[in-house]
Amino acid sequence: MKNIILVIGLSLSCHINFAQDWVQLEDYPGLGRNHPITFSIGTDGYVLAGQNENGTYVKDFYKYDTTTDSWTQLPNFPGYPRGYAYGIAHNGKAYVGFGTSNVFDIGPLDDLWEYDPVSETWTELASCPCGGRLHPAMLEAGGQIFVGLGNNNSGNLDDWWAYDLATDAWAQKADFIAEERHHPYFFSIDDIAYVGFGHGNDIYNDFYKYEPLTDTWTQVASLPAEGRVAGTQFSYNGKGYALSGDGDDHYYLETGEFWQYTPETDSWMSLPVHPGHSKWAPGCFVVGDVLYFTSGLQYDDGNSETLNDLWRFNLDEISSIEIVALETLVYPNPTTDKILLSSPVDYRLFSLKGELVLEGNGASIEVSQLSKGVYFLNTKSKTYKIIKE
């Protein structure tokens, strides 16, 4: 069966409308948590630390064997328990650090640790002279670990640092060129770093690439949707992915949005959403052609739950797609003044009683004059439920 995508706008992005299963797997045995540190080495995925459902920062450590669908608890991380921290894997080892801890009120952390899965041992490496921080971007590109942005007790940050694995030394690089922010999305593709979205004076949808060889930043295509923060991300097969998180009101998205970035075309494509509303501060890891998605806080019918779940999504199925029709993306929703569309379309807006209240053609619809309530926006291909606040 062919998968189908709908092209949005002038080939700047596209949207998949086929149903593809997210499969739920075995929960890990620890308490649910937000901000887990997640990574994969070989056929195993790892979940470490985070903030549990009781609001406590933890240091427990779990390994998931993808060949047997089973979890094993490993010895605790030897550093401080922490949340708002990150980790990456490179050349068969993992590197984790930063975040914050409630032990002795030490606040933002600047440490870096290496994990060897063969010996199951941790080694503390050189701390970053950048100072401690929560919610940074952390990725590997060109054999170096890059860390930057985030926030500390002084506010949001825009600095950028490189760690050299061979010399165990840090060097400051060119600052991020946009607004200071924390909790950005980030990944690397072909030794180039990509960083964006996140929360500063606003919640952003802009995106940037950093080239280590020239130490330069360049803005690339923004996400063709509302700004977002506190999701998870990864790269796979030459593309980058942004999954879940909060929207531009720092509240959950109605669906668990999943986006793919292609650097060759500088474009975004929407993929099948994960079950339920979006998650705040989940984690993920990739083994082979499979994405594993875990943890985070999720809302359902007004209630929230901090999860220890695990879901699987087959990434190789994304490659078989067929472009068939023009579609549009509508945001923000709810709205107070305007409805923005990702491309100009003919539209009609109806009240809940079925009365036509607006019609026209364009990519922006002024609705500030309308009463609060529920409306239905009809385009040639779809009808959207719109909430006017």
Question: Where do the language-model regions lie?
Answer:
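A broadly conserved detector of short glycine/acidic/proline-rich loop/turn motifs that flank catalytic sites
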Residues: 10, 246, 297, 345, ...
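Kelch-like beta-propeller repeat domains
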Residues: 19-318
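Intrinsically disordered, low-complexity boundary segments flanking structured domains
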Residues: 9-15, 159, 318-319, 373
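N-terminal cationic leader/targeting segments used for protein routing and processing
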Residues: 3-4, 18, 92, 238, ...
